Amino acid sequence: MLKMESTQQMVISVINTSFEAAVVAATSTLELMGIQYDYNEVFTRVKSKFDYVMDDSGVKNNLLGKAITIDQALNGKLGSAIRNRNWMTDSKTVAKLDEDVNKLRMILSSKGIDQKMRVLNACFSVKRIPGKSSSIIKCTRLMKDKIERGEVEVDDSYVDEKMEIDTIDWKFRYDQLEKRFESLKQRVNEKYNTWVQKAKKVNENMYSLQNVISQQQNQIADLQQYRNKLETDLQGKFSSLVSSVEWYLRSMELPDDVKTDIEQQLNSIDLINSINAIDDIESLIRNLIQDYDRTFLMLKGLLKQCNYEYTYE
């Protein structure tokens, strides 16, 4: 069995070797670029891409198919070789054509153009009709050959469903939007009116507070003026009091030293500060009462020495 499939085994070996070469080329490139990599991750990614490109492009099946044809020819089964003699000329031409086709297939697969897209593009073409939006779909000779070979099947699972077009009731949509707009407009107006009322109330309170402050300031000014007047009147009264007492003192028959002492106490009264003036007058009165008390005690003692008695009337 191994001898009969020797060509197939050789092709599989070449494909596997190509994969290993792709992995080595990828890792070597990353090392030359100074990029750190995980070998297992690179191996997995390259294998996934390599298997996809080889399978989707048909290169693997093409190589294995030719290997099977060669093995069958070596084993005396020349049917496949005879069927391919129409396009086989010589080994170099076939090898070159296969190389170019396989290269193109792999490039298309790597670009995301899979087998289904390539087959459909090869089987059909589109012809545009000048002046019209419609077009004509043409079958290529490959499609004709596939029909003749029975390689075209009808997919009964496909159901021609009628495309439903959603009809939009624009009037209903407009009415809905208009209602939403009116509702939003009403809410905005309500909030605005509420804000206006609050602003008016704040302004009224502010004006009322300003009036109260103004009235209080006027009252304070009046009280200050009245206080100044009282202060002036008191200063005048104290000055008149001092002058009157001095005049009355001079009319008394008291000794000069007593008059001088009392005048000094009168002149020491602070006539500018009313509170200090009251304190000074209080001190003067206390001193006078104290002097009167001493004089009375002296008189009382003198009466006792003279054996006199005294009474208050």
From Swiss-Prot:
Residues 166-237 form a coiled coil. The keyword RNA-binding applies. GO terms for biological process: regulation of translation. Residues 208-313 are annotated as: Interaction with host EIF4G1. It holds the Pfam family Rota_NSP3. Keywords: Coiled coil, Host cytoplasm, Host-virus interaction, RNA-binding, Translation regulation. GO terms for molecular function: RNA binding. It is found in: Host cytoplasm. InterPro entries: NSP3_N_rotavirus (IPR042519), NSP3_sf (IPR036082), Rotavirus_NSP3 (IPR002873). CDD domains: NSP3_rotavirus. Its main location: host cell. Residues 1-149 are annotated as: RNA-binding. Residues 150-206 are annotated as: Dimerization. Residues 170-234 are annotated as: Interaction with host ZC3H7B. GO terms for cellular component: host cell cytoplasm. Homodimer. Interacts (via the coiled-coil region) with host ZC3H7B (via LD motif). Interacts with host EIF4G1. Belongs to the rotavirus NSP3 family. Plays an important role in stimulating the translation of viral mRNAs. These mRNAs are capped but not polyadenylated, instead terminating in a conserved sequence 'GACC' at the 3' that is recognized by NSP3, which competes with host PABPC1 for EIF4G1 binding. The interaction between NSP3 and host EIF4G1 stabilizes the EIF4E-EIF4G1 interaction, thereby facilitating the initiation of capped mRNA translation. This is Non-structural protein 3. It comes from Rotavirus A (isolate RVA/Human/United States/WI61/1983/G9P1A[8]).
